[in-house]
Amino acid sequence: MEVISTNTNGSTIFKNGAIPMNGYQNGTSKHQNGHQNGTSEHRNGHQNGISEHQNGHKNGTSEHQNGHQNGTSEQQNGTISHDNGNELQLLGSSNSIKPGWFSEFSALWPGEAFSLKVEKLLFQGKSDYQDVMLFESATYGKVLTLDGAIQHTENGGFPYTEMIVHLPLGSIPNPKKVLIIGGGIGFTLFEMLRYPSIEKIDIVEIDDVVVDVSRKFFPYLAANFNDPRVTLVLGDGAAFVKAAQAGYYDAIIVDSSDPIGPAKDLFERPFFEAVAKALRPGGVVCTQAESIWLHMHIIKQIIANCRQVFKGSVNYAWTTVPTYPTGVIGYMLCSTEGPEVDFKNPINPIDKETTQVKSKLAPLKFYNSDIHKAAFILPSFARSMIES
């Protein structure tokens, strides 16, 4: 594995055995604004609903009420201090904090929120780009949040990852060179390695803290960064694509944040033009494209931009993810002019035999050829707006 770093930060050891993170300290590090184009796998623009994490009751009588010390934790001046020395900043508004729960709020889904019960806080810190937190949940295993938004759950995020990889790669024959923008935790790479035809994978992740969290808490994923076919680049994904060799990649996967704030450029015409230039004739791109229940106005704008750039085909697909807002997420799938790409009928499906025999990975949990085809069947209200 080749690692190319554009970061120049120092190194600091965290309290309580937390991983070294380039000058960050749990809950107290300076958070520098001015994110570069959202290349890490996260959704921006959310308020942090950081919940109080209770690290074990004493003799069945511990209870935290009205900010009073109960022997196990103390809440003062916007922080929660625990026996083990961890200190959580309460980054959300006071009414978003529920004992033992994490809650996700955003202006993108006003009037609703999603909450998970916290069993154990594993890591919290601030990088140069975002707040990073990992906790063990009661229902979905490890949960990664960036800027207060759930990015991936260990036991519930596989539909998103399998679909963002296999919808595009299952639609072209023998993909060899692939670029992932974002994906620093490693789930997307894990799925991509199912394809024996792949010879080269470039991963561009802006936030080295995300990669460090993967190495510490997801070693089975981080191990794939050492695959000889993989090059991990720590830097700006949009700049990387712009500088890429013309016609180099068979596929580009944009595992990015929401199209607001620092990630806004990743959904606009100049970025798509750079992507199209970096793809071979008949090459494909797949990017996260929001929820039809909340963001039809955003989806319509993304489609309009893609139709101006990609002269092959432009398609919208969707799937279900239990821990994302409204329980669904969408994808834009586009191809460049050249050999025809029919996204709705996979020609390179990853079935159980391929998975078990060739890639030596566990069988897929969500994706199959029927799910692939069904992903492009839209409800009437969405279809009429998208096809107009």
UniProtKB/Swiss-Prot annotation:
Renumbered to this chain, the Polar residues biased-composition regions fall at 1-14, 23-39, 46-88
Which branch of life, at top level? Eukaryota
Pathway(s) the chain acts in: Alkaloid biosynthesis; nicotine biosynthesis
Under the GO molecular function aspect, what terms does this record hold?
A: putrescine N-methyltransferase activity; spermidine synthase activity
**Pfam annotation, one family:** Spermine_synt_N
What's a single GO BP term from this record? nicotine biosynthetic process
What protein name applies here?
Answer: Putrescine N-methyltransferase 3
Q: Whose protein is this, by species?
A: Nicotiana attenuata (Coyote tobacco)
> What gene codes for this chain?
PMT3
